[in-house]
Amino acid sequence: ATLSAANDAKNTDGLAARLTGPQLEIHTARIAIAQKTGSVSKFATIPEDIAQTVIPTDSGWPRSVFTITTTTEDQQSKRLLVLTQDSARQNYKLWGVARLFQGAKLPNFAVPKIGSQMGTAKDTGLTMTPQEAVTQYADVLTNGANSQYAANFADDKLRQTIAEQTQNV
């Protein structure tokens, strides 16, 4: 309800109560763009119906919950939501959203009733650490095809949308 109200009013008041980290920055930027263009991007829609949730087994904080949504009413792809809780007495806040394009492959999660251990930004055993992936992808989003990391990532819809919005604003 808070995000819908913010989108409808094109106002960022109250977003920090529900969003944090990169998602707060992204949604704040989307509303700033909407204030200039007159409408919020349809890609800002976050489906409310949940297909799967992975609860953490970690006993400490911060904690993260991973949720996969259903498709939107206008048939946009599912989303992977990452919600974080900084302490036991704070509510979870939406930290990140990733659109899951058709054919996207996710690592296997532990049985949802059991939960999964939280990874770290420096976990190895993947193509690159999560920290390296974020740094490199941010460089690609900033510099497009001129990024030294452009070959490491597919030319996805997010890159195309950001490039298009950058040209329009």
How would you label these PLM feature ranges?
Residues 34-79, 169:
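Surface-exposed, charged secondary-structure patches
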Residues 1-35, 109-169:
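Core segments of small alpha/beta cavity-forming domains
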